Amino acid sequence: MKRWVPTISLVAVLFAGVTVSSVWGDDDDDGGSPKLSVTVAFGAGLNTGGPANHHVLPGIIHVKEGGVVNFVVAGFHQISVYQPGKRPKDIAVPPSGTFINDLDGLFFQGLSPAGPPPTGFSNTQNRVESVFFPEKGMYLIICNVRTHFLNGMFAFVKVDD
């Protein structure tokens, strides 16, 4: 019986080592070069109405030309992507209202979180929206909800080769 304890301990340590190494998998650490597919948090995941949820993580997203950014939307947010050259200070923010709706230079606009879900969608507040970036450039991404943008909910997608 005394021989079983060290044997079981050794098996447990080996199993834990295999489990930990499989969790790491392939981390694709290639020195920060852009990838073809990137996943981004759009909303901090708190699903609250406060500024703590008004984040896009990371703030600068790197993707290869012809790549896709998958925005994991958490909460009441709407993605607006602008053509290269548009800056946060260029956004025409109305003095009041729920949404900004600046269509000048708009490249992509996501699902509206307001009202009932569109046909075929079960939930427009917690979802994944994938955006294809066919050309190089620095694209501005904002939350189209006025107060969220004013709280700093924007980021950039840098498309490179």
Where are these regions (language model features)?
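Sec/Tat signal peptide C-region and signal peptidase I cleavage site
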Residues: V20-W24
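Extracytoplasmic copper-binding redox domains, predominantly the cupredoxin/blue-copper superfamily
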Residues: G25-D161
